[in-house]
Amino acid sequence: MTIAVIIPVLNEARCIGQTLSHTTTLGFDDLIIVDGGSSDETGAIVELFADRLLAPHSAPTQPPPCIRFLTAPPGRARQLNAGAASSRCDVLLFLHADTHLPMNARQAIATALSDKACVGGRFNVRLDSDRPLARLIGNMMNLRSRWSGIATGDQAIFVRREVFEQIGRFTEMPLMEDIEFTRRLKRAGRLAFLQDQVVTAFRRWEQNGPLRTILLMWTLRFLYWIGVSPYRLQHFYRMVR
């Protein structure tokens, strides 16, 4: 079983280097970074990292993944689809640029997908802060996901390639592409809700205040569930940020 990790980026210079350093040690086959038009040093950091990894003096403990840096029109769904189209791996794992996978991520995915009825899944999430509120947010995200059967991008969604193609890839919409995708994915078969944790940055909540961010996210998801267009939600999101 071959597994590709696909990371969409847009101005992620502050964190992409650390994420690449960690992810390349985990034994994946492809590592595909898809840039949606960064204006910072994201591209330069990725290219320098790839050059260093493949340098003759480099001595990794295991063969490094095939690293590719692509560009695509801005929009997370477009970037994810572009990355998926560039890989022929059996399994696609979609990872945020500020998120680190557990050390056993590859084995956990392989074990989950050894069940032929399982079409994909996600990991539990933990925020990289010791604040009690951060722990509460992570726990609530995991409970909400298990209760609803829906995964979000923070949780590192993975899927069999053939199922990804069969259900129509990510719908190219400005928001909620992860929720819309996993709605379709869970109709295709069983999802694995792995207890192993990815660690993601608390910065998104800190930038605009944790409580304000939680309220905004819950409001957006509620409006989406009752049928408000993602394009209208994008307009609302820009207004209140």
Please give the residue ranges for each predicted region.
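Short, well-formed alpha-helical segments that are part of the catalytic scaffolds
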Residues: 11-25
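Acidic helix N-cap motif at the loop->helix transition within catalytic regions
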Residues: 14-18, 40-49
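A conserved acidic beta->alpha catalytic loop
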Residues: 22, 35-44, 99-100
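Conserved donor nucleotide-binding strand/loop of the catalytic core
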Residues: 32, 43-86
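Acidic donor-binding/catalytic loop of UDP-sugar-dependent glycosyltransferases
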Residues: 41, 97-111, 183
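Short aromatic/hydrophobic "clamp" motif used to bind/position activated sugar donors
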Residues: 92
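Conserved donor NDP-sugar-binding/catalytic core segment of glycosyltransferases
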Residues: 103-133
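Hydrophobic helical membrane-anchoring modules
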Residues: 183-241
